[in-house]
Amino acid sequence: MENIGIDVKKPERTCNDPKCPFHGNLRIHGQIIVGTVVSTKMNGSIVLKRESRRLIKKYERYETKISKFHAHLPGCIDVRPGDRVKIAECRKLAKTISFVVVEKVN
C-alpha cells in the first residue's frame, strides 16, 4: 500500500482495481471535496452531493447551492447512500468522472 500524498486513513481491504489510488497506479492532485453520497447505482462509481450556503444581504436570507460530482469507487472502500465521503481530483477516468473516493468520513 502506498502513500497517496494526503492525510487519509488507509482502507483495510485490498483490491485489484488499477484505478485505485491505494492499490493501483492512479495519482491524485488538485481539489479535495467532502460531501454526501446520493447514489451508488452506477457500476464502480458514485454520485456525490455538496451543499453550500451563502447570505444574500438584500433579503437577509440564505441561499443553498447544491453541486453534484461523479466519482470512481474503488473496490476496497464500502459506501452507501447517505454516507459522508472524501473525494480527490485525478485524471479523467470517464466522460463525467474525474474524482476518486479516498476515505469514508464518520
Swiss-Prot record:
TM regions (residue ranges): none
Keywords, comma-separated and alphabetical: Ribonucleoprotein, Ribosomal protein, RNA-binding, rRNA-binding
GO biological process assignments: translation
Cross-referenced SUPFAM superfamilies: Nucleic acid-binding proteins
Keyword Phosphoprotein assigned: no
Gene3D superfamilies to which the protein is assigned, alphabetical: 2.40.50.1000
GO cellular component: cytosolic small ribosomal subunit
Top-level taxon of the source organism: Archaea
Pfam families, alphabetized: Ribosomal_S17
A molecular function (GO) term: structural constituent of ribosome
NCBIfam families for the chain: PRK08572.1, uS17_arch
Family stated for the protein in its record: Belongs to the universal ribosomal protein uS17 family.
Function: One of the primary rRNA binding proteins, it binds specifically to the 5'-end of 16S ribosomal RNA.
HAMAP family (UniProt xref): Ribosomal_uS17_A
Subunit structure comment from the entry: Part of the 30S ribosomal subunit.
Entry protein name: Small ribosomal subunit protein uS17
Gene name tied to this protein: rps17
